[in-house]
Structure formats: C-alpha cells, structure tokens
Amino acid sequence: MDITVVKGDITEQNVDVIVNAANPGLLGGGGVDGAIHQAAGPDLLKECQEVINRIGSCPAGEAVITSAGDLKAHFIIHAVGPIWKDGEHQEANKLASCYWKALDLAAGKDLTSIAFPNISTGVYGFPKKLAAEVALYTVRKWAEEEYDSSIKEVRFVCFDEENLTLYNKLINSEVV
C-alpha cells in the first residue's frame, strides 16, 4: 500500500473515497466537514439525516459511509474524531478507531484509494504531532493485518503547512 501526503483541498481529491472529519450529527459544520458538505451538494445532507434517523448519532471513534454527491470521489466516510480534553479520556484510541474503521469500510466496498484529512486537529484541538503519529501508526498497522486488502493508496490531505511538515517528517521515519 502506498501512503502519500499532500497539501490541498480534500474535496478535490481524485480517489475512490474521501474521509470527512464529521461531528456526531453528520450535519456539516465548520472546517473540512462544512467544505465537504458544501462541495458535495444538498443530497449529502439528506443522506446523512437518513443515517442519523436510523442510528441516532455517530459517536467519537465511529464511522459511517455515504455516497459522495457532486464530488469526484464515489463515497464519503464520515469519521467522528474525539475532542481533545487532556489525553486521559481515550482520545488517542478513539482517533485510531476513526482511521481503522474508515479503512475497514473502504475495504468492505473493494475500494482502492482513500484520502484522509487531519482528523480532530482543527476545532477539536487534538495535538497535531500526536494526531499524525496515531494516524500513520494506525494505517500502517491496518495494512499489516489486512495485507490482501483492495486498498492500494492512502493519501493524507493536509490543510496547513504545519501538518504537511509533520506528516512528511513522520512518514520518512521508522518511529511511527
């Protein structure tokens, strides 16, 4: 599996599925969540409302998949990252679960490429370096366990220079 890092707009990625850093209500909001909902069009909100009507809410660490509306991608996986409190409330485990469950959902649909944003590092306040370490470790661990998966490319789409630098540094190290 190839793991790449780019700086850019996740809504413009030409991959099978993009991951949305969603809130528990899946109703859009600020940051990447709002950008994805706006770019995908009104049908996405309708589909998300149907999902929430069925499941109630999507708690931190969980993920659901929907169609992608007007995006280049075919699907959107809505992963609800944890709000950072102090690191003593399972935040890292919940963040890892977002990545793991997103990969499971993508593989379950035999998709080959997936793009992740920097989940929980915006208004949710997760420390960027720790979030990058969790993301890369989890993706690599998943790839080891699911070596015969359909997924051939994982792309991290960074929204700022700080995340881009962190990911590039970590991706080239053996620490993660």
Swiss-Prot record:
Gene3D superfamilies: Leucine Aminopeptidase, subunit E, domain 1 (3.40.220.10). CDD domains: Macro_OAADPr_deacetylase (cd02908). Residues 1-175 form the Macro domain. It comes from the Bacteria. SMART domains: A1pp. Belongs to the MacroD-type family. This is Macro domain-containing protein lin2902. The lineage of its organism: Bacteria, Bacillati, Bacillota, Bacilli, Bacillales.
